[in-house]
Amino acid sequence: MQGAEVRCGGAEHLGPAGTFIAPTVLTGVRADMNVVREEVFGPVVVAIAFDEPEEVVTMANDTEYGLAASVWTESLSAAHRLAADIRAGTVWINSHSMYDASLPIGGVKQSGWGRDSGHQAVENYLETKTICAVI
């Protein structure tokens, strides 16, 4: 884990939901560590201390990936400000991995282009034809 401290979890876990690691919280994490720089597909929280909310946005956006993010706070207005500035396809507030088939799913940057689900995805299945005529 490149020096990060496993505060809880961390054991291998082949769960029914396709997870490969038990829910894990990591602390003592630096911005240059792989667990911060790469996409982590698992129930992993990377806890990094910060002084100002702007630092959170800078850290969150300082990666080539942007599939999803979670903002956890008591201040809903602060959460909305952060969510608007974080470059990710989905930002959850005080939750994670909430899905609804009516909402678009997709990332930004190297995490993908386009959207699945929602009305945006319907365009992928349409074959639009343009017909022009001189009358």
Language-model-detected regions and their locations in the chain:
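Conserved C-terminal structural/oligomerization subdomain of aldehyde/semialdehyde dehydrogenase
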Residues: 13, 20-135
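Short secondary-structure junctions
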Residues: 3-12
